[in-house]
Structure formats: C-alpha cells, structure tokens
C-alpha cells in the first residue's frame, strides 16, 4: 500500500510540475540558463572534475549547450546519455566535440543521441565519472529527485557504485519552479548531492 501511495503521489506531482514548467516564459528561461551556466562554471566540484556526464536538454529542461562547450574549452572529457528505449538501461558515451551534437540522430523524445550501432567509449568501461549533471522534473532541498519515471539515472548510479566503487558527485540543474517542499521517494530513488537553481529576479 505504501508503494502505491508513493507512486500515486509521484504521478500527481509530475503532472503539476509539467504544468509549472510550461508556464515559464522564454525570457525567464534564458535568464536562468545564463545564471546557472555561470554558477556551474564557477563551481569547485565542476572545476576539479575531469570526466563529466551531462544531459542534452529536452524543451522543458535547463539548456546545457553552453556548459557542454565549456567542458570542451577546459579540456575535460564529456559523456552524454544514450538511453535504450523501452528499458531502464542507459550508457554514458563519449562525445567528441560540442559541434557533433547537431549531427547525431534524434530519439522519439526529440533528443540527440548516438545510435546503438555507433561504437563509442562508455564512461564506466574507461575509468568512471567524476561528476554527473542530472535532469529531473522536481527536487526538494534534501536532494530528493523526481525523474520522469523510467529509472535510467537511479539504475546507472547503482552501476557506478558497483563498477567504480563510489558514486560520482551529482548536481541537478533546475528552474526554481521545480523545487518542491518534499519529493515522494522510494528505496530505488537515488538522491542528488546538490540542486542548483536560480532565485527569482
């Protein structure tokens, strides 16, 4: 019964957050994006990380393009998610350059990602990750995260623990509209180390 209550609470919170995200103006999106990019670039954890995984944004997520460009400018190694649709399996595969993104095929969710037949270095096979930037629909101040319900990141972080013996540092990028008093969680949900967002103008 408890599990059903949690999944019901997650469902209704997801619907509410999607609505809140749709209401954010284009100007506000740009403002948050710029300020968050600056916050990330100045962040100690980012500066000391060499192998970084970052998501390519969906329309209702913080745009990560400028951060990706900076990762390459700083000579760091960039990995992006390759989701296996119809499953909860995801790999973090190496990106050769920021310019390469636009030439990658698009998934049914309209996100660029390398195809399954495109052989690329997977982060965990070549030394793990120092830092993972996490997408999500909602977060609370304790780092609890509400994803889109597929479990890709929770499953991947478990793999990191098994294969590199430690969880990479995790930072969520969010609009303040995504910060909730409390996110409903269960045992499989992995919390994030830090949620970065921008306060009201």
From Swiss-Prot:
It is an enzyme of class 6 (ligase). It is found in: Cytoplasm. Its EC number is 6.3.3.2. Mg(2+) binds at residues 154, 189. The keyword Magnesium applies. Keywords: Acetylation, ATP-binding, Cytoplasm, Folate-binding, Ligase, Magnesium, Metal-binding, Nucleotide-binding. It comes from the Eukaryota. Monomer. This is 5-formyltetrahydrofolate cyclo-ligase. It comes from Oryctolagus cuniculus (Rabbit). The lineage of its organism: Eukaryota, Metazoa, Chordata, Craniata, Vertebrata. The gene is MTHFS.
């Amino acid at each position: 019964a408890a599990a059903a209550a949690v999944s019901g609470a997650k469902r209704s919170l997801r619907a509410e957050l999607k609505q809140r995200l749709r209401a954010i103006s284009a100007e506000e999106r740009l403002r948050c994006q710029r300020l968050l990019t600056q916050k990330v670039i100045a962040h100690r954890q980012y500066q000391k990380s060499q192998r970084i995984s970052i998501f390519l944004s969906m329309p209702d997520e913080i745009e990560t393009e400028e951060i990706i460009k900076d990762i390459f400018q700083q000579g760091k190694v960039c990995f992006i998610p390759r989701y296996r649709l119809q499953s909860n399996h995801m790999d973090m595969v190496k990106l050769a350059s920021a310019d390469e993104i636009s030439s990658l095929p698009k998934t049914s969710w309209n996100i660029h990602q390398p195809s399954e037949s495109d052989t690329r270095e997977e982060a965990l096979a070549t030394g793990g990750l120092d830092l993972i930037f996490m997408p999500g629909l909602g977060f609370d101040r304790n780092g609890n995260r509400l994803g889109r319900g597929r479990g890709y990141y929770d499953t991947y972080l478990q793999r990191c623990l098994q294969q590199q013996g430690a969880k990479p540092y995790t930072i969520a990028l969010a609009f303040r509209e995504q910060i909730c008093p409390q996110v409903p969680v269960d045992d499989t949900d992995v919390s994030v180390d830090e949620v970065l967002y921008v306060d009201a103008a």
